[in-house]
Swiss-Prot record:
Role: With S4 and S12 plays an important role in translational accuracy.
SUPFAM superfamilies per record: dsRNA-binding domain-like, Ribosomal protein S5 domain 2-like
An annotated GO BP: translation
Lineage summary: Bacteria, Pseudomonadati, Campylobacterota, Epsilonproteobacteria, Campylobacterales
Cited Pfam families: Ribosomal_S5 (PF00333), Ribosomal_S5_C (PF03719)
Family affiliation: Belongs to the universal ribosomal protein uS5 family.
Entry superkingdom: Bacteria
GO cellular component: small ribosomal subunit
Name by which UniProt lists this protein: Small ribosomal subunit protein uS5
Species of the source: Aliarcobacter butzleri (strain RM4018) (Arcobacter butzleri)
Free-text comment on this protein's domains from its UniProt entry: The N-terminal domain interacts with the head of the 30S subunit; the C-terminal domain interacts with the body and contacts protein S4. The interaction surface between S4 and S5 is involved in control of translational fidelity.
Listed NCBIfam families: rpsE_bact
Amino acid sequence: MAVNREDFQEAIVKIGRVTKVVKGGRRFRFTALVVVGDKNGTVGFGTGKAKEVPDAIKKALDDAFKSLVTVSIKGTTIAHDIEHKYNASKILLRPASEGTGLIAGGAARPVLELSGVKDIIAKSLGSNNPNNLVQATVEALAKIKG
């Protein structure tokens, strides 16, 4: 599925510095976790690793466009409650009445913002590791039956 990248917005969820200790000292690299979405029912996430931060972000964006999923949005919210677990992270998503807004924290918030859901209540249960929480949220949104 060919997508027009200009229609999508991006959010950098996490940038981390990782270290490899070698004989001559330490070698630093950077990891990036990025979420992309068109605020109209399509969202994806990706990770990238490189020696410089901008390169890691670019790799993460390329990865994110390979993992786009379609979200079934009913009005400004989702159709039903859903609970999804990925590794030790668990996310609970509940539909909310119009005007409630986006009540979500941590790494789940940018995923829900960029998916186009405007009224939702999300609760993170278990681990708040950004990588696992983003994946749990995306998988939960993909499982919703319209």
